[in-house]
Every structure is written in C-alpha cells, then in structure tokens.
Amino acid sequence: MFFLLFSLPCLGGMASGLLGRKIGVTGSHIITTSAVMIAAILSIIGFYEVVLCHSPVTIHLGDWVHSEVLTVSWSLTFDTLSMSIITTVLIISSLVHLYSIDYMSSDPHNQRFFSYLSLFTFFMVLLVSGDNYFVLFVGWEFIAVCSYLLINFWFTVIEANKSAMQSFIVNRVGDMALSVSFLAIVALFGNVDFSTVFSLAPMMNESALTMIGLLLLFGGMGKSAQIGLNTWLPTAMAGPTPVSSLIHSATLVSAGVYLSLIHISEPT
C-alpha cells in the first residue's frame, strides 16, 4: 500500500507525459487525477496505521551507492511526521488536479500540464518519505525543476519566463547551503541515514553541528520563502492558477518546514 501511494503519482505523470498523444486529453485527465486521488485515499489509510496506530513503515528499494567509504540506499520511511505531510500534500494535489480539469480545458497542452503536476506531487512525496539526506536531496531538487516547468508552463509569455528563472535562481541560493551541509554531514558522520546521524549527533563537535544546522536552516528558508529568500513566491503566480495554489499551499513551501522539523524531533 505504501509503495503504491508513493509510486502512483509518478506512473500517472509518466503516462501523461510520454503517452499523451495516444491517450488524449481526457485519458490524461482520468489517469493522472485517478492516480493522485487513489494515492490520497491510501495516504489517509496509511495515516491511520502509522500515526494513530503508531506503526511506522520502512521500505528498502535498493542500494544507490555501496562502497567501503559510504553506503547510500534508496529507502523510504513512513513515520508520524512524514505521513502527516504526505497526506496533506496528496489531498491538496488531488483537489488541484480536479480543479485543473475545468480550468485548463481550453489549453492545447493539457497532457504536459498534468504530467508536470503529477511529477511535482511524486517528488514531494519522495522528499518527505526519504530515509536519508541524499534521497531527500533528490526530491528537493526535482520539485525545484517541476516548479520551474509549471511556473514557465506558458513559456511564450515573457513574464512567465522571468518569474520561473527568478524562482529557480533564488532557490539555488538556498540549495547551495543545503548541498554544503550534506557534504559536511558526510565528512563528519560518514553516513547519511537520518537514524545514524541523529544517534551520533550528541557525540560530535558542537561547533560543527551548529554550522551544519545553520546551513540546513538557510537551505530550508529558500524553499519556504522566508525573509531574504521570499522574492520568488509572489512572482510564481505568473503560471496557471492551479500551479499557484499547489506551490503556495502546504506543498512546496512545506518542504523547508519538513527539513527543520526532522532535526527538531527525531522521526518516530
């Protein structure tokens, strides 16, 4: 069930993007919206199991990097914090998909639009469910790419071009700090798994931990559009209205909140 709620938005987005001409506009609407709505229903069931019944779930998909120096795995953990955000994201995304069917009805590029929406949702779920910093980083960067594509959906409009570029560049400032913090974590801990890092943190140098914490906070400020890195958020409304609702709601901006919360309280 948890693998389905994770993978359905990706499958829907890929079907709409790669097979859009064959399945048509209506087919794209049905596939992407159904996939996200089913994932949302599964997330509600998962929320009951994980949060209310206190039964966290971990899924190991395979190793990404395996060496004597560092091991990075493709692992997903559905705990109280991640399921709370995933459920919110999928419910809001399913509503945005439904609204977009009518709103984008006159646009000739529906398949591309719904593909972007679904892939954005998928990478947001990947970010929140990742069991280590590198899986989180993959989701983090790809939601930036998807948000750029969505804001710049009407790419023939100069205002949309400028807004998308501004969003992309401002987020890169925060992402640079995030990248440095992840490299520092690898150098200090020799591991990127949340559980290992959190358990070893009390034994590490406080100055190094403070520096890493500040870098992580600065990285989160970019996604959450906090003071100094908030200039991209108002201009993001240059994209279609459903894009603005998805980015301005508890989806993209919640990524920075999640990054902060996982370090305030160890996932359980």
Positions of PLM-derived features:
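...captures the hydrophobic TM-helix bundle architecture rather than a specific catalytic motif
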Residues: 1-265
